[in-house]
Amino acid sequence: MKILKKIFQVIVKIINHCVPVDSRSLYFIPHPNCRTDKYDIINYSSDNVLVLLNYLLKKDSAEYYKIYVEIYDSSRISEYQEYIYGINPNIRCTFLCACVGRFFFNKVSFKDMLYAFFCFCRASKCFTATFYYDFSFKKRSQQIICLGYYTPFKDDYHMGDHSYDKFRNTTCNSFDYSIATSCLSARIISIDCGISYDKFKVLGFPRNDLLIPKNNCNVIKREISKFAGYDVTKYIVYTPTFRDYETVTEGNLRSILGYVDCDLLKLSKILLKFNAALILKLHPLQNKTVLKKDLPKGILVFEQTYKYGLYDLLSFSDGMITDYTSTYFDFLLVNKPVIFNFYDIEEYRRVRGFSFEPIEFFCAGDIVYNYNELIDAVMGLLAGKDIHAEHRRHISLLMNQFQDDNSTKRICDIFLNEI
């Protein structure tokens, strides 16, 4: 199998080098998690590639380009075409199956894979949301730009075995540039993924430009109130990361907040007192079989929808509860309170680890280790208690070099200067 894969890679490289590059052709690959999160060219605000693409589409100069976009739901192509036509009927945009850079990880027809590959061969620039791709077959006239999807929090360097070193070498040869939110972030990600530090550009994440409240917020709020069954006026979003070490054994089912034995009705009463809702956005890779399913009023599980995504919720949220997810660093830009739910921190530190130690120094908010502390922190947040504003500002300046909403523009000024 390894020999066949090697032969295939050589053939791919030869073919790519034989196909001339069109300087006006661009290739976009959204994050693979868009498949489960239902993010796409219409519901785009939570993915860096999709935000950049929409920024381009809404410029008059979009007609200058030939645009190729990988998609994860082919049944929505007609909706995508209608969406593009509504923006500008003269835009040339082709939708492709998601496969380039991951030929051995996608179940697509050979015909679709071949067509997507030849479209890639023509592209002068390719924008991805993650570095888990092999573009070592690219030619020098092509630029591969990783727009990024995280700011370091968890330890990603030690999460793989020795074969991960080979992956880092491949990654270094695959990408020409990688976008980060700060110099500190760039240095750590460089170590994690193998892309050399000199290839990083600190420009900020496009999705963070949209953390300001948007016109559709009232529509989303009405949907939340309808689902909750009462008029919700305050919102807390819970964004836990996944635990790859969790398995189901008899009696170990935990609540969705992490605790095995806790009275969620107690939290429910507090939420209802303040007309608040706790909206749980689970990680796409979370093992849901370890979670108890019954939830009282006021505690809602975000169900993936093509209408809106996580960053739409964050844009009007009154606060966040999180654990070890890097979404926290993005949320710092709106300067709202954060609660850190560290119910399993010692196990997580042992199994996965962190990018920084002591991690608590970077946590600008209440840190809780048990359910009663979580209850108190939520009550304080809803009552308007906020003693961590200055700490948030310091950490945000450390992890977000730019505190504005111009990241997408900065990226376009460098890589798409025809706009």
Residues covered by each model-derived region:
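Donor nucleotide-activated moiety binding/catalytic core segment of transferases
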Residues: 95-98, 109-123, 279, 284-329
